[in-house]
């Protein structure tokens, strides 16, 4: 399975977000990871 950093839904292998707008507790960090995943 995917390993995601606690407090985020996008930082790590894959993501655990239900949709693109869901970020988790650490929103600024997750936003950066989400943008990077889209590269």
Swiss-Prot record:
Origin superkingdom: Eukaryota
Known EC number: 3.1.1.4
Any one Gene Ontology BP term: arachidonate secretion
GO MF, one annotated term: toxin activity
Class of the enzyme per the UniProt entry, highest EC level: hydrolase
Reaction it catalyzes: a 1,2-diacyl-sn-glycero-3-phosphocholine + H2O = a 1-acyl-sn-glycero-3-phosphocholine + a fatty acid + H(+)
The name this protein goes by in its record: Phospholipase A2
Source organism: Bunodosoma caissarum (Sea anemone)
Organism classification: Eukaryota, Metazoa, Cnidaria, Anthozoa, Hexacorallia
